Design a protein with these regions (language model features):
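Carbohydrate transferase catalytic cores enriched for Leloir-type hexosyltransferases
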Residues: 1-418
């Protein structure tokens, strides 16, 4: 029986539907759920001070039988106050002054939690391992040398493209500066492992393993007409049009503007009038403004930017799309194409970084910066129904090679050997 302290901070915001619910959030959540279900694991939850309040409610609702290493239940009133302010903060996010006021209140309460919430030292004395799916290993864990420490690292993209995400670079530096020679690192792809070894050769040694991510079990083909009609109506997608689907953050690295421009060219070149593009995902404000500058993309009724999509609506959107596009400039893994394949949707992705590890030969792979290859790929799928069916089937078979059960099984095996 392994006694694992799990840093569940990244999933504490499960109650808030915002752009924090990214691939890393879902990775942390699915690994947590699968570990909690295993009979050979005794799981203990840990939350950072700024996640304590939300964490106690997550535990009570989803993991009532899983103990927590902190005594947060003693401060339920403060937890409720924190959650209320957090809801207000989200609701006024677009208003700079109010956002600052509520943000300051949240920081003050986090400081209070860091001073009053105590760690159960008895549980630490019997713990075998500490697993962090995102954040650095807490300093207090280092005081217990018998606890083996494990981190899951996703990508070094802020170092590959430092100008695009300076905050991400700072975040990774903070993690890597805090690591010790005894830490064990899991990576979601060989590409990510190689990148970290390139940028942090003195930190990453032989204590590593590649353990791929997976799509949630809820992602499966949903061709129920009633469900699709409901989703179309909810996101204002024309009922009389076929659609291409994309899901990503609206950031430059995702190469979305190029993909959209090529789609418009493809439609105009071939005189097509029965298909549109549905672009979903959490928006980076500055990039969304850039997208709006491309008036030709938004003025002809071909592009529908639906923004954040509820989790329960994604299977229908994936499963009923003509094809899915994810021609990113660079990825650490690439979870959306895997979700699309698991829903029986043919995919088009770029042929770089980690994406070949995910898609293999189950989709069309192209150069991310080639307009010609984008247009050719769209034409192949639009004019060849058999190819769409063939790649949809290949995608389903490819997706079966990934599962959260396999991911967690590999993690536990490594922990048992170390």
């Amino acid at each position: 029986m392994l006694n694992i302290v799990y840093d569940a901070s990244v999933v504490a915001n499960i109650f808030y539907k915002n752009d924090n619910r990214s691939g890393i959030f879902f990775a942390g959540w699915n690994i947590l759920k699968k570990m909690a279900q295993r009979p050979d694991v005794n799981l203990i939850l840990y939350f950072r001070s700024d996640c304590c309040a939300d964490g106690i409610f997550l535990k009570e609702k989803f993991l009532p039988n899983t103990p927590c290493i902190q005594n947060m239940s003693n401060y339920m009133f403060l937890c409720k106050v924190y959650r209320k302010i957090h809801c207000w903060y989200d609701s006024v996010y677009c208003h700079l002054y109010l956002r600052k006021v509520f943000g300051l209140a949240l920081k003050m309460l986090s400081c209070v939690f860091s001073n009053i919430v105590k760690v159960d030292k008895k549980r630490l004395q019997t713990a075998d391992a500490f697993f962090s799916p995102v954040y650095k290993i807490p300093d207090f864990i280092r005081m217990y040398p018998h606890i083996k420490t494990y981190l899951y690292l996703y990508d070094a993209i802020p170092f590959v493209f430092p100008r695009l995400n300076p905050y991400g670079k700072k975040f990774i530096v903070e993690i890597m500066q805090s690591t010790k020679q005894t830490d064990f690192f899991f990576f979601d792809s060989c590409c990510s492992e190689n990148d970290f070894k390139t940028f942090f050769p003195s930190k990453i040694g032989y204590n590593t393993a590649v353990v791929p991510l997976a799509a949630d079990e809820t992602f499966k083909s949903d061709r129920n007409a009633q469900n699709l009609n409901s989703v179309r109506e909810k996101y204002h997608i024309p009922a009389n049009k076929k659609y291409v689907f994309s899901l990503s953050t609206f950031e430059p690295r995702k190469n979305l503007i190029r993909a959209l421009k090529c789609f418009v060219t493809f439609v105009e070149k071939n005189g097509i009038n029965d298909i549109v593009w549905v672009a979903a995902g959490a928006a980076w404000v500055s990039f969304y403004k850039e997208l709006k500058k491309e008036r030709a993309l938004l003025s002809n009724g071909l592009i529908f930017c639906v923004g954040y999509v509820d989790d329960e609506d994604l299977p229908a959107l994936y499963g009923n799309a003509e094809w899915f596009v994810y021609t990113s400039q660079y990825e650490g893994f690439g979870l959306p194409p895997l979700e699309a394949m698991q829903c029986g949707c043919p995919v088009i992705t770029s042929n770089n970084s980690s994406l070949p590890e995910v898609v293999d030969d189950a989709g069309i792979m192209i150069d991310w910066e080639s307009d010609e290859q984008h247009i050719e790929a769209y034409e192949k799928y639009y004019f060849n129904e058999e190819l769409r069916k063939e790649n949809a089937q290949k995608g389903l078979e490819r997706a079966r090679k990934f599962s959260w059960d396999k991911t967690v099984e590999e993690i536990i095996k490594k922990m048992e050997k170390c």
